[in-house]
Amino acid sequence: MRKEIVEKMEQLIIPPASYTILGIPLIILYIIIPIIGVALFTFIIAQRLHPLIKAAPDNRLDQFGLRVFNMLKYAVGQYKQPRYMLAGVLHIVIFAGFCILSLRSLTLVIAGIKSGYTLPLFDTWIGTIYNVLKDIAATAVLIAVVVAAIRRGVYKPERYKVPEKLGKDHTAEAIFVLAMIGGLMVADMFFEGSDLAAHMNKGIETHYFLFPLTGTWFVTYFLTFCSEATLQFCHVFFYTVHEVIFFSFLNFLPLGKHFHVITSMFNVFFMKLNKGSVKPVKWGVSDEQLDDLESFGVKNFEDFTWKHILDFYSCADCGRCADQCPANHVGRPLAPRFITIKCRDFCFDKYPLKEESIDKGPLIGSILEEDEIWSCTTCGACEEECPLLIEYIDKIVDLRRGMVDEGMVPQSLQKPLNALGKRGNPYGKTEKKRGEWTKPLLKDEGYECKILSGKKAETAEILFFADSITSYDDRIQEIGQSSFRILKACGVDFGILGPAEKDSGHEVRRFGEEMLFQDLKEKNTQAILDSGVKKIITADPHALNALKKDYDNLPPVEHVSEFLFRMIQEGKIKFKPLENQGDVYVYHDPCYLGRHNLIYDAPRVVLDAIPGLNRVEMERSRDRSFCCGGGGLMLFYEPIEETRMGKERVQMASEAGATVIVTACPFCMVNIEDGIKTSGNEGKIRAIDLVELVDQQIIK
């Protein structure tokens, strides 16, 4: 019986592969279109692979299982899309529909060559279920592309806009691609609907389950008013339209920002796995071999690694990175997406599909600007937001390495860098004074600090690594002293390196001075290993990140907030109630504690353990925290900006109703206290470090 129905179906509507016009079989056209489409696509992809092959090496094949998991989570699962809810939902609908309907499109391509072709088992109940899913998906995708096109073309959210000097606007391209996707949906609905309408007009039952209220359902009932000849025309015409759009779409993708449709899976698979770290100067070159390199960093396009060029290909130009970038927010000449857009345009110009290569010279000065690259605080907000895990910090650090190698260092950074080379700290103060922040503790409280270096070196289980700002800045020394008291109260056997300690070099490396960083790292590593400590604690997230991510073979490193969290969990410390319980506290997540090291809960648990403390959250908190302005060398840099990040952050705290801003980073303290002054909030809002608050409230 089923065979008879199929035969009757074939008699009603002639399938495209069997149709002729003026005696010419259309199957010839349906063979030519895929051949040309696939050949052209292969040529374009080969050209796009050329820059990747010429690029610098990059090691991205480790931890295969984790990479597969990340690909399933971020690329297939669209994990980060809902962070921008409307755009995210629209993208998820289109992506899910794309996954379901790609199988349909491939089947149709084959059906144009082999009449009546269906996939194995698709003539059973499996095919019925798939057809229902296909019709629902096509309807949802069509609605989504219409909404997305109106949103992109009419409402034009601010984050999509592109200043003319920074690259071309992609609105027209986005709407064109949405139109092609919508065209594929409509073509398939009319192709399927014309066949179903023909059978309905003849009263012949089909095996196709027409799901109510889908696009195919509406089209089918609309077409029942048409003649058999019209239905035949629709069947062949819309099949041809589908073929042309499908292969045009395929070949258009690698020509612009929609290349991410093809590259995103690969880009996420090869994502950076070690957050907070910085790539080596060159893969395959050890630290000991750096002296042999003729050039450092990125100066020309081919100096980028192949993964970073893949990043350029994969950017969807959604603007999320720039929308979250604090440098962009305060008017600095930096928006991460424009680095990608300009470099991708440069790549397409330098490696065109057919003309000769267009070489525009070095990147800095011709494509990218010095101030643009120095404006970045390496806070990681852009990378945290990107749904395709595009990396910016490593590119910026490599560009800075190239500029430093060419002597292109901002005037405001030259003095602190020279001081770091001579004295091991950016303030130019002597090494002998590095441990003097502990003297008031001995004088006023009788606490003597162990010095774990020098001829009279003592021994201890734990090293408290102060770093430069805690050692030399009068205000921040109070944070070190509070940390000292807390460790003493907890009965910890600890000490400091004193004169043997050098700056951790965290910002030195991220500002491109690799050889200076290596020198600081070598001296610190030797001093730490010689001390014989089994663990390191620091109150500085930048030092934490450097010692954990940039150094090798050190004892375990812990931020003081993690230590306090553990002490609370073990019941080893208790707090007395706050005296002034009318204050409203808010916690500011330091970038290098939160985004780069994923320490969000420990400081909050500590705060919530203090009786009577009323805590609120800022809108931009945790992994969306707003950078205070940057630490280390960024304190010395004089950027072009309309306002200060610290001032903006204080305003956010004020809007949350806070009267006390708590942070867990000495650099955040400097910037936030400055922000309180410049925003006119003195007397209304105050700032305190987590360890200072704990020092006040701990029962000793």
Residue ranges and their predicted role:
Residues 2-18, 111-129, 193-234:
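Membrane-interfacial helical/loop segments at transmembrane boundaries in membrane proteins
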Residues 41-59, 110-114, 147-162, 189-205, ...:
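Juxtamembrane/interface segments at transmembrane-helix termini
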Residues 33-40, 141-145, 232-269:
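Alpha-helical membrane-embedded segments
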Residues 183, 219-229, 280-281, 285-288, ...:
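Iron-sulfur cluster-binding electron-transfer modules in prokaryotic oxidoreductases
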Residues 5-154, 303-312, 334-338, 347-555, ...:
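Iron-sulfur-cluster electron-transfer modules
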Residues 234-236, 250-376, 423:
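Ferredoxin-type iron-sulfur electron-transfer modules and their immediate structural context
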Residues 92-104, 175-202:
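Hydrophobic alpha-helical membrane-insertion segments
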Residues 60-61, 65, 83-88, 122-133, ...:
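Membrane-interface segments at loop-to-transmembrane junctions
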